[in-house]
């Protein structure tokens, strides 16, 4: 009777290895999905929205391809209407100045 109870709690090394491998595989998939979600929220999409907004803004009709103060900007693609594009250590770049 005692040997039956003890054998129920013993696990073979193959089962333990398979559980560890499954855990590591699922952890990798979870991290990969987080990376893909973050990539989907790339600032390039936000830059496109700024350009579309500026195209429809009558106040900004002379400077249609620029970002207003405190809007996000990118030194490569979108210039600021007035002021300069400031990029902090953490976070998105934004237009600063008048």
From Swiss-Prot:
Subcellular location, record wording: Secreted
List where this protein forms a coiled coil.
none
What keywords tag this UniProt record?
Disulfide bond, Ion channel impairing toxin, Knottin, Secreted, Signal, Toxin
Q: Which residues form the propeptide?
A: 41-64
Chief subcellular location equals: secreted
GO cellular component entries: extracellular region
**Known tissue expression:** Expressed by the venom gland.
Q: Which GO terms describe its molecular function?
A: ion channel regulator activity; toxin activity
Source organism, top-level taxon: Eukaryota
Q: Where is the signal peptide?
A: 1-40
Taken from the UniProt record, the cysteine pairs bridged by disulfide bonds within this chain are 66-81, 73-85, 80-95
Function comment: Putative ion channel inhibitor.
Per the record, the domain comment is: The presence of a 'disulfide through disulfide knot' structurally defines this protein as a knottin.
Concerning its family, UniProt says: Belongs to the hainantoxin family. 17 subfamily.
The molecule here is called: Hainantoxin-XVII.2
Name the species this protein comes from.
Cyriopagopus hainanus
